[in-house]
């Protein structure tokens, strides 16, 4: 894990499959199929994997279910849209291509939250949520996550850093995001709670297009890159 989350060259090299689901061994991509797929599946917790399709040889075109299972196992992040057209068209015609587009890479979802409605000035607030990743792959780059307190009265924002490492929100595993957040410096009043998951680079942190948008409906504020938790906290 320490090497996988590191910055060495080996921690930055991912995988590309040039003939995905095109033969029993993907045109020679694999020699020991089961062992090598298991290896890639584990490596893909830290580095991206993806590729493109090919004309099938000796096997039928992969079904939607087969492609979905394989992308999930190998934690796919990207798929070439230019090749191989007939395979991609089969997936489009069977109404699974749109799902693949949604699930490639990470897809972070706030599954549930238990949040108190009141807190005391200079006290603390307990953030108690469950986060899911319903995409095929984890987040690979470090991000800075903040709980945002936005005053209902005038829109003033108070930004509190979390210790949350979003890279550890893995596919198909509930992640308990529980942190005690200091309310020091936030005056009494009513506050909307929002979550900002911004880029780690200073030059990109204020650009909303580099912030992570949760997959929940009606929560994204695109102008600022904020996710509305749809909860109001009274500090008194």
PLM segments and residue spans:
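A short linear-motif detector with a strong N-terminal bias
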Residues: 57-59, 86-93, 125-128
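Extracellular/luminal regions of secreted and cell-surface proteins that mediate adhesion/ECM remodeling
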Residues: 100-236
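Catalytic-core regions of glycoside hydrolase
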Residues: 1-84
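Catalytic cores of secreted or luminal carbohydrate-active enzymes
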Residues: 64-115
């Amino acid at each position: 894990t320490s090497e996988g989350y590191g910055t060495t060259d080996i921690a930055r090299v991912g995988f590309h499959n040039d003939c995905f689901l095109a033969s029993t061994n993907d045109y020679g991509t694999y020699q020991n199929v089961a062992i090598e797929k298991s290896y890639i599946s584990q490596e893909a917790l830290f580095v991206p994997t993806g590729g493109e399709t090919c004309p099938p040889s000796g096997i039928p075109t992969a079904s939607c279910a087969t492609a979905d299972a394989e992308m999930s196992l190998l934690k796919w992040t990207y798929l070439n849209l230019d090749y191989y057209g007939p395979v991609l068209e089969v997936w489009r015609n069977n109404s699974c291509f749109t799902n693949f587009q949604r699930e490639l890479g990470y897809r972070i979802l706030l599954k549930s939250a238990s949040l108190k409605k009141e807190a005391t000035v200079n006290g603390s607030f307990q953030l108690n949520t469950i986060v899911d990743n319903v995409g095929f792959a984890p987040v690979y780059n470090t991000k800075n996550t903040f709980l945002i307190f936005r005053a209902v009265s005038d829109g003033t924002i108070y930004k509190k850093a979390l210790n949350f490492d979003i890279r550890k929100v893995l596919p198909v595993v509930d992640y308990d995001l529980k942190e005690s957040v200091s309310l020091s410096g936030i005056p009494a009043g009513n506050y909307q709670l929002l979550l900002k998951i911004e880029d780690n680079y200073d030059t990109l942190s204020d650009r909303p297009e580099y912030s992570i948008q949760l997959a929940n409906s009606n929560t994204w504020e695109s102008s600022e890159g904020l996710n509305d938790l749809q909860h109001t906290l009274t500090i008194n």
